[in-house]
Amino acid sequence: MDVAIIGGGAWGSALYKALLEKSSVALVSRSGREGIHQCSLQEALEARFLVLAIASSALRGWLNEANLPPKTKILVACKGIEEGSGALVSEILEEFLPRENLAYLAGPSFAKEVREGLPCALVIHSHHLELAQEMSQFFPSWIRLYVENDVVGGEVCGAYKNVIAIAGGICDGLGLGYNAKASLVARGLVEMARFGQYFGAKIETFLGLSGAGDLFLTSGSTLSRNYRVGLGLAQGKSLEEILIELGEVAEGIKTARAITQIAQREGIHAPIAHEVNAILQGKNPKESLKDLLSHGR
C-alpha cells in the first residue's frame, strides 16, 4: 500500500479518490463506505505514508490513542490552532514524531472539486524538502504540487483564512457590497501575514497559494463551510442551528477564539479575528462589521 488516509470526512474522501488514480490507497474511518478500500490503523502503518485528514481539535487525542512508531511519515491535511494552548498543528505533532517525517498540505482546494477531478495547485510544506518531494509523486497530474519549507507560514495561512472566510460570509450576508468585501479580504491577508511573521513565517508564503490563493477561494464561496457559517450568522441564525445544517466541522470557529487569545497575550493587532470571535460569542454581526470597516480600526 502506498498511502493510507486517516479520516473519512469530505476532505479525506476527496483525497482518497484523487490519490487512487496513481497510487494504492486505503482509508481508515469509523464508518464503512461502499466502493472504498478500508483498513485498520495497524494495517495503515504499513503504507509509505499516512495522510491525516481529521479535525485539528481531535488531533492530540488521536495521537495519544494511536501511539505511532517514530518512523511514521505523515502528510497533514488538517488546519487549525489548538484552543487553550495556542499550539499549531505542527507543534502538536512534533511532540509525538520527529519533524523530518512530517509534511503539511496547503493551498486553495475545495473537497468537492478535488473529488470531481478538477485541476488545482497545492503546496506541501516541510522542514525536509526531500520528504515533500517524495510525497508529491503519489498525486495525480491534475493536482500541481509545489514544495516549500515554511511550515509555520503554511499552517498560519491554512488556519487564519478560515476566520477571514467567516467574516467574508458575514459581509456578503449583510449585503455590504463588493467594495466592502474587497477591503475586508485584503485587510484580512495583511492581518494573517502580521500574525504569521510574529512567529517567524515568511511574507512570501502569504502572497502565494497557501495564503492569498486559499484566502480568496475560501472567503467567497458557499462551498466553504466557514463562509457558510458567516452567511448564517448574518441571516440571524444561531451558531447551533448553523452547525446542525452544516453537519461538518467548521475549523474557523475554534480558530477565531485561539487567535484572539494569542493576539491579546502577545500584543498582535488582529481586529478581524477579534470581531469574528465576538460575533461567535453573540455580538451583533452588523455592529461588528460597521466597527471593522469604519475609520480607526
UniProtKB/Swiss-Prot annotation:
GO terms for cellular component: cytosol. The active site is at K161. It catalyses: sn-glycerol 3-phosphate + NAD(+) = dihydroxyacetone phosphate + NADH + H(+); sn-glycerol 3-phosphate + NADP(+) = dihydroxyacetone phosphate + NADPH + H(+). Coiled coil: none annotated. It is found in: Cytoplasm. NADPH binds at W11, R30, K79, A111, R225, V249, E251. Its EC number is 1.1.1.94. It comes from the Bacteria. Keywords: Cytoplasm, Lipid biosynthesis, Lipid metabolism, NAD, NADP, Nucleotide-binding, Oxidoreductase, Phospholipid biosynthesis, Phospholipid metabolism. Its main location: cytoplasm. GO terms for biological process: carbohydrate metabolic process; glycerol-3-phosphate biosynthetic process; glycerol-3-phosphate catabolic process; glycerophospholipid metabolic process; phospholipid biosynthetic process. Sn-glycerol 3-phosphate binds at K79, G107, S109, K161, D214, S224, R225, N226. GO terms for molecular function: glycerol-3-phosphate dehydrogenase [NAD(P)+] activity; NAD binding. Pathway: Membrane lipid metabolism; glycerophospholipid metabolism. SUPFAM superfamilies: 6-phosphogluconate dehydrogenase C-terminal domain-like, NAD(P)-binding Rossmann-fold domains. It is an enzyme of class 1 (oxidoreductase). Catalyzes the reduction of the glycolytic intermediate dihydroxyacetone phosphate (DHAP) to sn-glycerol 3-phosphate (G3P), the key precursor for phospholipid synthesis. Belongs to the NAD-dependent glycerol-3-phosphate dehydrogenase family. This is Glycerol-3-phosphate dehydrogenase [NAD(P)+].
